[in-house]
Swiss-Prot record:
Top-rank lineage group of the source organism: Bacteria
Protein name: Fatty acid desaturase
Organism listed in the record: Bacillus subtilis (strain 168)
Renumbered ranges of motif Histidine box-2: 112-116
Cysteines engaged in disulfide bonds, as pairs: none
Amino acid sequence: MTEQTIAHKQKQLTKQVAAFAQPETKNSLIQLLNTFIPFFGLWFLAYLSLDVSYLLTLALTVIAAGFLTRIFIIFHDCCHQSFFKQKRYNHILGFLTGVLTLFPYLQWQHSHSIHHATSSNLDKRGTGDIWMLTVNEYKAASRRTKLAYRLYRNPFIMFILGPIYVFLITNRFNKKGARRKERVNTYLTNLAIVALAAACCLIFGWQSFLLVQGPIFLISGSIGVWLFYVQHTFEDSYFEADENWSYVQAAVEGSSFYKLPKLLQWLTGNIGYHHVHHLSPKVPNYKLEVAHEHHEPLKNVPTITLKTSLQSLAFRLWDEDNKQFVSFRAIKHIPVSLPPDSPEKQKLRKNA
């Protein structure tokens, strides 16, 4: 098959999937009802259960965390303007769900759009993605950079401490170069979060609020980071230098199909169909599965399950020569192939 034929087929696939990129107001409203009502109901039940048993409270917060994850998926769709047809409604709902999930709407919308435009591009890493080094970059790095990278990639730091740091601290500040509208949106989000937390503390008591909201926040945050991590970090993923990079290949080869049990698939808003989402970000979450089922090429993408996804914990570095993720242990037998004065090595020296 020639490169022109492959390019044509990729273009056709993108067009076909884009046909599903139409929000349906009825489905969106139903999703709001079957997400927000259970979430707030579970939150209140968890509060009431504090007088019975904290183990019962924790059990309820685990379920509530699943619904907060689903709320984040709605927020995510609003950022892509795919939840409602009208941009205004996406902005309003995006702001409100951003307050609940601790994300400033416009800031995350901007960084996430860059993630989509540069996903799997080795020359355009660094915005809206997880820090990833290649084997050659890691071997050429200073001891300090290696230590920082190993700490960053430690599961406890990435999935427990990481969400706390990102959601509570970095999300509260504007990025360098942010426009006025984005900066104001971040300030308003912060004010709304403080106001909501203060109101809950006054109504329920600060201790009760923390005992209920704390576990929900920690669990949903860990779930969110895990989903983002595992859907781009699997053994035979796709990463290329800019000159060889393809948007379609990055979507269907660099984004996994995370095949989850139906209940978990529902709670996570079908985000396991990540290859479909990256191919056409404007497809609403409730249409991702249908788009996947209607196109045979999408059924042949990298597929991972709950069990096999755990293998991703060992994948720390990208091996450019063998086109796959490897563990720290595996690189002992891989020679450095960076030229002495390569741009990558110079960049590493500068950043180290």
